[in-house]
Design a protein with these regions (language model features):
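Membrane-embedded multi-pass helical conduit in multi-pass membrane proteins
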Residues: 54, 354-452
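A short, conserved alpha-helix in the catalytic core of glycosyltransferases
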Residues: 263-266, 274-300
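N-terminal signal-anchor transmembrane helix
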Residues: 30-89, 105-108
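A conserved acidic beta->alpha catalytic loop
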Residues: 96-116
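Long helical/loop segments within the catalytic core of UDP-sugar-dependent glycosyltransferases
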Residues: 116-142, 147-156, 160, 164, ...
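Short aromatic/hydrophobic "clamp" motif used to bind/position activated sugar donors
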Residues: 167
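N-terminal membrane-anchoring/stem segments of glycan-assembly enzymes
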Residues: 1-58, 240, 372-375, 401-408, ...
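Cell-envelope/extracellular polymer assembly enzymes that use nucleotide-activated donors
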Residues: 60-63, 91, 265, 280
Length: 496
C-alpha cells in the first residue's frame, strides 16, 4: 500500500512540476509580448492626437452606462466626475437597480431630476423600468429607475435607453481619467472592425482627492489593498496586453469597457443569469462574429485609466474573488462548444484551453499540489534540499514577473510618483507569495462548491467615496487645455 501511495505521490509531483513549468512559460511569453507592446505604445504615443478626438464633432459619441445598487455614498461624486470628461459628445445613463438606500434621492437632490417619457431604442428583456428621468440642470444626465434585477439586467436597461453608437460600461464606484473616453474612441475610429475595447483598472485606495477629482496617486497603508495593486498590475500589464496583442482577449473588466451598441444588441446584451456578465459577453461577441464570419477586433488599451476602490477587509475580498471565479466557470461551461474548434480560431484552440486548464483547474491543482508536496516531504519521497530549491525558484520567478510589471508601469505611465510608493509595492510583491496567493487559490478552488448554491446578486462593498463633491453647480466644464495633461500635449511623462 505504501509503495502504491509513493507511486501516486511521485506521479502527481511530476505532473505538478510539468504544469508549473508550462504555466511559467506562458506567463513569460505574455510578459514579453506585453513589454514589446508597451515599448511600441510609448514610441507611438506622441503621434496620437487625442485632443483632436476629444474636440471633433466627427468623433463617435458615447453613452456612459453606470449601474448602481446602494451607491448613495459615492454616486453623486462619481457622476459629477464623469461629467468632467474631456469629450465632445456623451451622455451618462445611471441605472438605479432597485436600491434600498438613498441612491435615487441623492441623485434627485443633486440634479433636480424630472420624469420624462423616453422611448427605449432596443428591446433587450429586463426587469420593469419604473421611470426615466433627466436633469434640467445637466442635459447629459439620464437616470433610469427600475426593479432590482442585478448588474447585467441594469446594464441591459441602460443599453436599451442609450442613444449613441458606443456605450461605456463602468461601475458606480469608479472614476475615469478626464481623457479616457477619447483614448478608447480612438481605437474604434482607427480600426473600424473594433467591437470592444477594455481599459486598465487601477486601485484608488490611499490616493488624495480635490474637488471630487483625483489629485494625487498614492499607495494605501492597508496591506490587502497594496497586494491587490500588484495583482492588478500583473493582470493588466503582464497578462491582458499579451492576450490582446495575440488577438485572444477574452476578458474586458466590467469596471471599464467600451462597446459597439449595435453588435451587443444583436447578441442579446448581458446575460443576467451569470455573475461574470462582462467576460461572458466578450466571449459571446467573439463567438457571434466568428459564426457569422464577421470581423471581430476586441482589444485592450493600457492607457485609459479607470480608478476603483478595492476591498480592504478579508471577508469582502474573499466574496469578490469567489464571485469572479464562479463567473469564469460559468463563462467557460456555457461556451464549451468553442473548445478546440478551428472554426473559432485562436480563441477556441488556444485561449479556451488555457482558461480551462490554468484558470479553472489551476487553483485546485495548486492546492492539491501544496498538500501532496508536503506529504511527499514528510514521507521522504521529496528531499528537503529539492523542496527548498523548488520553492526558491518559484518565488524568484514570481518576483521577476512582479518587478517586471512595476518596471513597465514606471516606463510608460509613472502613476506612482513617490519612491516610498514604489518601495511599498516592491515589498508587497515579496509578501504576496507567502500566504496571500495560497489563500486566494483556496478561495478560487472553493468556488466550484459555492457555484451551485448561489443566486445572482450584487457584490456589495463598503465605500469610502471620492472625497468632497465638486463645489457649486452640477459639474465642472470639461477642460480641453492640452497643458493639463502631458500626453494630450504630445509630451512624455515628466521625470520624477
Amino acid at each position: 500500500m505504501t509503495g502504491l501511495l509513493e507511486q501516486i505521490l511521485h506521479g502527481f509531483n511530476v505532473f505538478t512540476l510539468g504544469y508549473f513549468i508550462v504555466l511559467q512559460l506562458i506567463f513569460t511569453l505574455l510578459a514579453v509580448v506585453g513589454w514589446r507592446a508597451i515599448e511600441d505604445y510609448v514610441e507611438r504615443r506622441p503621434m496620437r492626437d487625442y485632443r483632436a478626438v476629444a474636440e471633433s464633432e466627427m468623433s463617435m459619441p458615447v453613452s456612459i452606462l453606470v449601474p448602481a445598487y446602494n451607491e448613495a455614498p459615492s454616486i453623486v461624486a462619481s457622476l459629477r466626475s464623469l461629467l468632467t470628461s474631456q469629450f465632445v459628445e456623451f451622455e451618462v445613463v445611471v441605472v438605479n437597480d432597485g436600491s434600498t438606500d438613498e441612491t435615487m434621492a441623492a441623485l434627485t437632490d443633486a440634479f433636480g431630476l424630472v420624469k420624462v417619457g423616453r422611448v427605449p431604442r432596443s428591446n433587450i428583456p429586463t426587469q420593469l423600468v419604473r421611470g426615466v428621468y433627466t436633469s434640467p440642470l445637466e442635459p447629459r444626465v439620464v437616470v433610469i429607475d427600475k426593479v432590482n434585477g442585478g448588474k447585467a439586467d441594469a446594464l441591459n436597461a441602460g443599453i436599451n435607453h442609450a442613444v449613441y453608437p458606443l456605450f461605456c460600461a463602468i461601475d458606480a464606484d469608479t472614476m475615469l481619467d478626464a481623457d479616457a473616453l477619447s483614448r478608447l474612441v480612438w481605437e474604434f475610429q482607427a480600426e473600424p472592425e473594433t467591437v470592444a475595447v477594455g481599459g486598465i483598472v487601477r486601485i484608488v485606495n490611499g490616493s488624495e482627492f480635490e474637488d471630487g477629482r483625483l489629485a494625487k496617486v498614492r499607495t494605501p497603508r492597508n496591506l490587502l489593498a497594496n497586494l491587490q495593486i500588484i495583482e492588478y498590475l500583473r493582470a493588466f500589464l503582464g497578462g491582458r496586453i499579451g492576450w490582446s496583442k495575440s488577438g485572444m482577449l477574452l476578458i474586458i473588466s466590467g469596471a471599464f469597457g467600451l462597446f459597439r451598441r449595435d453588435v451587443c444588441v444583436e447578441v442579446g446584451g448581458y446575460d443576467p443569469t451569470t455573475v461574470g456578465e462582462d467576460a461572458e459577453l466578450v466571449l459571446r461577441l467573439h463567438r457571434h462574429q466568428r459564426e457569422r464570419k464577421k470581423p471581430c477586433r476586441i482589444t485592450f488599451f493600457p492607457d485609459p485609466i479607470c480608478w476603483t476602490e478595492c476591498p480592504e477587509d478579508l471577508g469582502t475580498l474573499v466574496r469578490q474573488r469567489d464571485r469572479w471565479q464562479r463567473g469564469l466557470i460559468e463563462m467557460v461551461v456555457r461556451h464549451r462548444k468553442m473548445l478546440l474548434r478551428p472554426r473559432y480560431g485562436r480563441i477556441g484552440c488556444v485561449a479556451m484551453p488555457y482558461f480551462i486548464f490554468f484558470e479553472l483547474l489551476g487553483p485546485t491543482i495548486e492546492c492539491f499540489g501544496y498538500a501532496l508536496f508536503v506529504l511527499s516531504l514528510v514521507l521522504g519521497i521529496v528531499s528537503l534540499p529539492f523542496a527548498l530549491a523548488f520553492f526558491a525558484v518559484s518565488l524568484t520567478y514570481s518576483l521577476v514577473l512582479s518587478f517586471l510589471v512595476i518596471l513597465m508601469e514606471e516606463r510608460a505611465f509613472r502613476r506612482y510618483p513617490g519612491w516610498s510608493d514604489l518601495i511599498r509595492l516592491t515589498l508587497c510583491a515579496v509578501v504576496e507569495n507567502v500566504g496571500y496567493r495560497q489563500m486566494l487559490a483556496v478561495v478560487r478552488m472553493r468556488s466550484w462548491y459555492t457555484l451551485a448554491s448561489r443566486k445572482q446578486h450584487w457584490g456589495e462593498m463598503t465605500r469610502k467615496g471620492f472625497g468632497p463633491l465638486l463645489p457649486g453647480g452640477v459639474g465642472a466644464v470639461p477642460c480641453l487645455d492640452p497643458t493639463a495633461d502631458p500626453v494630450l500635449a504630445g509630451e512624455a511623462p515628466t521625470e520624477r
